[in-house]
Amino acid sequence: MNVRTIADLGPDERAAFFDRDAGVDAVRDDVRDIVSQVHEEGDVALRRFAEEFDDVSVGNIDITDAAERAYEEIDDDVREAIEDAAANIRAFHERQVPEDWRDDFEGRELGRRFRPLDSAGVYAPGGTAAYPSSALMGVIPAKVAGVEHVAVATPPAEEVNPVTLAAIHVAGADAVYQVGGAQAIAALAYGTETVSATDIVVGPGNRWVTAAKAEVRGDVAIDFLAGPSEVMVVADGDADPELVAADLIAQAEHDENASVVAVTDDADLAEQVVDAVDEQADGREREAVIRAALDNDTSGVLLARSMSEAVLFAEEYAAEHLSIQAADDESLLERIPSAGSVFLGPYSPVAAGDYATGTNHVLPTGGNARVTGGLSVDTFVRSTTVQRLSEDSLGDIADTITTLAEAEGLDAHAESVRKRFE
């Protein structure tokens, strides 16, 4: 990782930062085949893929009972941490629950009604690292929304990570299945002999998971298509380079394809961050993953000519995680509307939101924060508009309705209004 100047970036260098994608094209055909086999063969396909991809011979696909046992068996301090994080996540998401309303609009009674989806499927990743926190982030908003049946799929293993299972139990999931990857998404979307089909499938995962979500979208709802983790730190000259570096390293350890970027208008800070990143990466448990992420074309320390240029770059980037470590952080925040989740000040590490502040860490990547937000109660709620008109209030707008209907050539629409006054 080295310092590059924004103004000096060539077209290809600049495009690397903004043309981030989930990398699904390379696996799309294989994923389509996996999804098709699960759809057609059910549990047989799930067991076959567990052998092929996870090197595991799966007995019971449904391991719901194992989640409760894991909760009892894990270390007390880990159990307490899970419960504390869950309480914070639940409290934050309870503030999001929408309320039905009806109002009078010149005699027309109009309103909105909110109802939860009937079922939801949550993917809790495994692979190179287990993510019990993702189980909390996916299940809790669904249960807060009132979803009756929430199922979790997590990759199979000789022993599925007990901390992940305990987190699934604490979150309140109704069913747990040991199935991973694209085949898990297909199972949650279409159902098998063991796995119940759900109305929506949510949760982060690798490019196979993301490609599968793209494949089933249309037959089932999804949250969004997420790619590798990313963070952008916008910092002024007063920022602590050690803290900036720590936040970059923390996201880099997720995935060798992660994107980690710092932007500053202070040349000294930029060089200090580069040095601090190199020092802090040394000796970390996932150092190889970290250094691979740091070497990506989508990672770097960028020097801006001014904070205004830094802000413009950050807004165009639309980071999954945006950390603002600057004296006027609130002012800068107002100028960067596009970000999945924002962390203000030196004592708001991105890791806090990843685990325990209560906000959700399932967030849009690849610039999609320009048009959508992260996982929330809204993800699991459907809204319906409601209207009741009296004879008088319908009469007030009858001419408007009939005139517009006839202008569109839909005379039956117009007649359906006139009939009420015959």
Swiss-Prot record:
Cofactor(s) in the UniProt record? Zn(2+)
Enzyme active site: E320, H321
Q: Name one GO molecular function term.
A: histidinol dehydrogenase activity
Give any Gene Ontology cellular component.
Answer: cytoplasm
Catalytic reaction annotation: L-histidinol + 2 NAD(+) + H2O = L-histidine + 2 NADH + 3 H(+)
Q: What does this protein do?
A: Catalyzes the sequential NAD-dependent oxidations of L-histidinol to L-histidinaldehyde and then to L-histidine.
Question: Is Zinc set as a keyword in this record?
Answer: yes
Q: Which residues participate in substrate binding?
A: S229, Q251, H254, H321, D354, E408, H413
The residues that hold NAD(+) are Y123, Q183, N206
Question: Family assignment?
Answer: Belongs to the histidinol dehydrogenase family.
- The UniProt annotation places Zn(2+) binding at Q251, H254, D354, H413
Q: Which domain of life is it from?
A: Archaea
The protein here is known as Histidinol dehydrogenase
Q: Which NCBIfam families match?
A: hisD (TIGR00069)
Instruction: Supply the InterPro entries for this chain.
Output: Ald_DH/histidinol_DH, Histidinol_DH_CS, Histidinol_DH_monofunct, Hstdl_DH
Q: What is its EC number?
A: 1.1.1.23
**BP terms from Gene Ontology:** L-histidine biosynthetic process
Q: May I ask which residue range the UniProt record assigns to the signal sequence?
A: none
Which pathway or pathways does this protein act in? Answer: Amino-acid biosynthesis; L-histidine biosynthesis; L-histidine from 5-phospho-alpha-D-ribose 1-diphosphate: step 9/9
Keyword vocabulary terms for this entry? Amino-acid biosynthesis, Histidine biosynthesis, Metal-binding, NAD, Oxidoreductase, Zinc
Coiled-coil boundaries: none
For this chain's record, the cofactor binding note is: Binds 1 zinc ion per subunit.
- What top-level class of enzyme does the UniProt entry assign? oxidoreductase
